[in-house]
Amino acid sequence: MAPTPSSSRSNQTQYTLIRTPQTKQRLNFHSKTPNPDGSKDPSPPEHPVEVIGRIRDYPDRKEKSPSILQVNTDNQTVRVRADVGYRDFTLDGVSFSEQEGLEEFYKKFIEERIKGVKVGNKCTIMMYGPTGAGKSHTMFGCGKEPGIVYRSLRDILGDSDQDGVTFVQVTVLEVYNEEIYDLLSTNSSNNLGIGWPKGASTKVRLEVMGKKAKNASFISGTEAGKISKEIVKVEKRRIVKSTLCNERSSRSHCIIILDVPTVGGRLMLVDMAGSENIDQAGQTGFEAKMQTAKINQGNIALKRVVESIANGDSHVPFRDSKLTMLLQDSFEDDKSKILMILCASPDPKEMHKTLCTLEYGAKAKCIVRGSHTPNKDKYGGDESASAVILGSRIAAMDEFIIKLQSEKKQKEKERNEAQKQLKKKEEEVAALRSLLTQREACATNEEEIKEKVNERTQLLKSELDKKLEECRRMAEEFVEMERRRMEERIVQQQEELEMMRRRLEEIEVEFRRSNGGSVDETSGFAKRLRSLYSDDDPGMVKSMDLDMGDPEPVKQVWGAVSHQSSNTISSNFTNLLQPKPSENMLTQMYPDRVCLSTVFEEEEVEEEEEKVIVEDKSICLITTPMPSLNSEGLGKENCFNGADDKESASSRRLRIQNIFTLCGNQRELSQHSGQEEDQANIASPDKKDNQFFSITNKAEALAVEEAKENNISVDQRENGQLDIYVKWETAADNPRKLITTLRVTKDATLADLRKLIEIYLGSDNQAFTFLKLGEPCGAQVAKEKESTVQATSLPLCNGHAYLATLRPGKSSQHKSLQPASPLPLNPIENMMEVTPISKVTPNHQVDEFSSPNLVAHLSSTPFITLRRH
């Protein structure tokens, strides 16, 4: 050992007192009998105590001081550096916690000792060191890193055979204030004497007899996990107190004894309380000082035992402490090995404690067992001792057998109870399974129902989609059909209008010729009518231009119609048409109140174009009752009045009035009046009458021919079918126009007729009711009675068709309060064909030009597009 430099006398004295003993100072146990084999050299001495150094890391501090410990490359020599020098200690191994965890430390130094215990050896592992050096942490570990206790149990029981032969018996003892307590058992009486420490009242105190604790309880098993959990739980019952040196300082020694009865092995794990200074620990009070004194007493007693054995003294003071009494077998048994783990701190503040710990370990390492030490088992020198040992083992085995039998009975009882509980649980499980089966069946049924419902839903959805597609297709076809029908109707109306224009031109030509003028000389009525429809603009706008282009006075002719009977037509017209000064010949022929007007459109100040439907004013045919004209020269040409031979003058006037109303040429009438005034003085009354009769006869012939073409008798129609005119009437005093003409079978009812009318109205359908038969202005027919009323019971119209009069329902009754107006009505009435209805005279005298086919095409008003300015 290198000399330590010293600057003071005190330092020399200190190092002299703690000098490590050398080999020459070791004392060997001499044999009482000489060696039988004296010729052979003695075997090398055996070291029963192995010392390992475990250096903990620094505490959790912000500033770490340099370490005072330094390990050589052989990992067996530790050098402690100080300001005045250094000192070396030789150990069997050194481990730093910063470099090696508990697992590496266990595999490197402890695992081989545990393997020896499994084959029957005895081993004692002691944790020695000052408080706060990490002894309990190395022994028991923590949650993340298990300690030596758990790893030892795992190695002993982990590789056991499948039969489960290997098991251990574990005893946990506590040495506190030089008293031994059993941590596995508790005292329920709780009548301990005064002065017992707090926390020890529930523990059982034991006595030492024959180097063992008498009546100590133990736990046995084959599972390392369960046993280690139990050990950790009872270890928490140790006396622990917080001091200035350690926040959780153990105030007692803990001894864990693991016996392996099958092989006779034993493992003793000793976690010693840390030696400490009373002043440094800050212990105050009698009890605290007694705890520290007793802890130091046990440590000092163990130190004396080690020194005595190392020095070879004849007397070893095992009885100085309860701890050394329990460890006596570990030091005296030849098969026992001691592993002493020295826990130290590298902190310079703990240098004095570190030196004391290393000196204690170096002293224990000097213990040797020489070759001359008698081996009682080997040579059989002491049979009595071996017999005692065998007897103790047999007794232990007997006790163990008895305990196993009692445990077996207890386990059988527990097994029976467990079987009963198992049967109950099985019954409950069976009931739950049956219930689960029922619910699964219900769930299956519900799933089947859901599947069926889904299938039905999909089927209905597909059918609905098909129906919707079919309805859409039918609607498109219906719209297309209506569009075509409207186009055909427009074309037909245009053709009829063209035909009427030609007829009117012919009438104009004939009229001019009859007056002695040429066709080319006059450009009045015919040219204006031709120019009216030759352009693309609507006719009504042209009529407005005609009225406002050349304003001339319009004369209203008022006259009286004679109600006296006459045998000839000429005498009748002679009395009716008396020429007056400054009056036109045509105005003389219209004594009724006639005023031809044009509907002017108001311009609205807006930003987009609108279509306004302008309806011509309905032509009201006003006739006065006339006596029948019995002329033999005229035939029955009127289809509505077969009794008269020739039309009256009033009927002819109304026919011409309708023609002029169609054209809307009010100014032309005044021009003709002016021209005829000039010719009134030249032509005689007889010549005027002849000319007038020639023109009216030709117009009458054309009208009769047209009426014969359009009016087809009922006999000429198809067998079994009827024609029905549908008329819309908002109120009794406000008659409207014909809607349409329907053809039905003879056995049809009003209900069938309603369906056809609703189909015709389409999306603009409006509630309506039929008026009672024969009473167009009377009460209404109930809807539920329509299926019982035949269509043949409707009144005849013009002798060849039936008339059905409709009236709006309750939702549209308020329209009856509105005055009759040619302005646009509701959407349904605007869609209807505009047909002027004439009031029928008592004699049913109707003009040929008022037939439905002609009037329907002449009275429709074209659309007029007004551009907003």
Swiss-Prot record:
SMART domains: KISc. Gene3D superfamilies: Kinesin motor domain. ATP binds at G129, P130, T131, G132, A133, G134, K135, S136. Residues 1-50 are annotated as: Disordered. PROSITE patterns: KINESIN_MOTOR_2. Residues 1-36 have a biased composition (Polar residues). Residues 393-515 form a coiled coil. One of its GO terms (cellular component) is cytoplasm. Residues 48-367 form the Kinesin motor domain. Residues 38-50 have a biased composition (Basic and acidic residues). One of its GO terms (molecular function) is ATP binding. It holds the Pfam family Kinesin. GO terms for biological process: plus-end directed microtubule sliding; vesicle transport along microtubule. Keywords: ATP-binding, Coiled coil, Cytoplasm, Cytoskeleton, Microtubule, Motor protein, Nucleotide-binding. It is found in: Cytoplasm; Cytoplasm, Cytoskeleton, Phragmoplast. Belongs to the TRAFAC class myosin-kinesin ATPase superfamily. Kinesin family. KIN-10 subfamily. Probable plus end-directed motor protein that may contribute to the transport of Golgi-derived vesicles in the phragmoplast. PANTHER family: KINESIN-LIKE PROTEIN KIN-10A, KINESIN-RELATED. Binds microtubules. This is Kinesin-like protein KIN-10A. The gene is KIN10A.
